[in-house]
Amino acid sequence: IMEYSKERMDDLMRAYDEYISSCDYIRMSEVYKIIVNMPSRRFWVSDIRAALIISAMMRGKTDLSTMCPLKKEMYEEIYNRVFKLQEEYPELTISELCAKVIAQPAPKFYLTPGSAKVMVCKARKQWIQEKWKRLRLL
């Protein structure tokens, strides 16, 4: 279970709602392709995991070629930001730098459209169930 799954879901639903409300005509096949490439509030990875991968990258001890392309792209973006931040804050550890970087807005969600579709459908189903539960209580 992912550490930030609820927050990531809320952020993805924000992007979904934002995109849907901006459309005159909605093509569901396009929705998920677009929202996964919309900016995200942060990088959806734990600071511990990011620090492990980034420190291994800095030592040349990790093979990113075995990673799925989106994860690889995300870690490369984090690595580039950590590298720049390290010049500004040389006294900080890699863990501290990673924690700062992953809290920054990310250029996208680093999810496949298929994963986003599954997540959005699950969230909408939960939302509908909660709405029905509230209606029954009235």
Task: Please place each PLM-identified region on the residue numbering.
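C-terminal engagement modules used by replication, chromatin/transcription, nuclear envelope/ESCRT
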Residues: 117-138
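Short, basic interhelical loop/turn and adjoining N-cap
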Residues: 36-53, 99-122
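Residue-identity detector for glutamine
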Residues: 86, 104, 126-129
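Basic, amphipathic alpha-helix used for nucleic-acid engagement in HTH/winged-helix/SANT-Myb modules
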Residues: 1-21, 28, 33-87, 132-138
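A detector of tandemly repeated sequence units and domain arrays
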Residues: 27-34, 93-100
